[in-house]
């Protein structure tokens, strides 16, 4: 069974060693989906959505929201951001009956990166 929760945050960045619009400072409203794979425990839940929300907000959203991403992720491409997010969540979101399965990060409504467990 898969359990997912979506989040939004705003941040600014620029892409280094890139020739185009994205080399200049600009911002995005990012959308993040975090998915766990697991088996419901005795309480019927893979993981309480409240716990999932708390972990993602604390480890990712509160760190990145309204930040200059290059201070946190030097080459802040969406691909590198997804990998950074995975590293922040991998340990806290792996329990006895569930594991971090997928991170999807949208930079725009039509452009996104998907990172899955098998790619780690």
Set out the residue ranges of the language-model regions.
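Charge-rich, low-complexity N-terminal segments
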Residues: 1-120
């Amino acid at each position: 069974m898969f359990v997912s929760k979506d989040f939004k945050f705003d941040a600014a960045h620029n892409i280094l060693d890139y020739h185009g619009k994205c080399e200049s400072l600009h911002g995005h409203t990012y959308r993040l989906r975090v998915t766990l794979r697991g088996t419901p425990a005795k309480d019927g839940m893979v993981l309480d959505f409240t716990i999932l929300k708390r972990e993602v907000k604390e480890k990712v959203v509160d760190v990145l929201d309204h930040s200059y991403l290059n201070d946190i992720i030097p080459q802040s491409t969406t691909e590198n951001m997804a990998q950074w997010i995975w590293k922040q969540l991998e340990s806290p979101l792996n329990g006895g009956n569930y594991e971090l399965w997928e991170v999807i990060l949208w930079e725009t409504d039509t452009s996104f990166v998907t990172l899955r467990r098998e790619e780690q």
